[in-house]
Curated annotation (Swiss-Prot):
GO terms for molecular function: ATP binding; DNA binding; zinc ion binding. Its cofactor is Zn(2+). It comes from Streptococcus gordonii (strain Challis / ATCC 35105 / BCRC 15272 / CH1 / DL1 / V288). NCBIfam families: transcriptional regulator NrdR. Belongs to the NrdR family. Residues 17-26 have a biased composition (Basic and acidic residues). Negatively regulates transcription of bacterial ribonucleotide reductase nrd genes and operons by binding to NrdR-boxes. It comes from the Bacteria. This is Transcriptional repressor NrdR. A zinc finger (unnamed) spans 3-34. InterPro entries: ATP-cone_dom, NrdR-like_N, RNR_NrdR-like. PANTHER family: TRANSCRIPTIONAL REPRESSOR NRDR. The gene is nrdR.
Amino acid sequence: MRCPKCGGSKSSVIDSRQAEDGNTIRRRRECEDCQHRFTTYERVEERTLVVVKKDGTREQFSRDKIFNGIIRSAQKRPVSSDEIEALVNRIEQKVRSSSDNEISSDFIGNLVMDELAELDEITYVRFASVYRSFKDVGELESLLQQITKGVKKKREE
């Protein structure tokens, strides 16, 4: 494993433990050249999934793409990277549990939106505004009304 700081190829594992999702091993490493400490994650290599986009093009499934999209939506919000990592793990697990090797981008986007609605409403709205490509303020307004109705129902329960 190359050191992200100096590029050295020799590192030793200081700590190794199972991550919260149960499917990943978290390893704490130390570079033998510069003593920089960094974290790596090890997980089982899964079958290749293909995402079919709205325009019909296909690309390989990327959990990093989901993670980065959520990170952008959650900027300056009280959402930790651990919460986002757990959310992405749940989404990936749902996608991989599907029997199909091809998954629509709509299916993935809806999974992300469902998870974000539970995590943080502002992050949800930010993600939705990009994902759904709102044409005007009216579309955004109707989404906000749906969220408001959902919040009222939760408070009544």
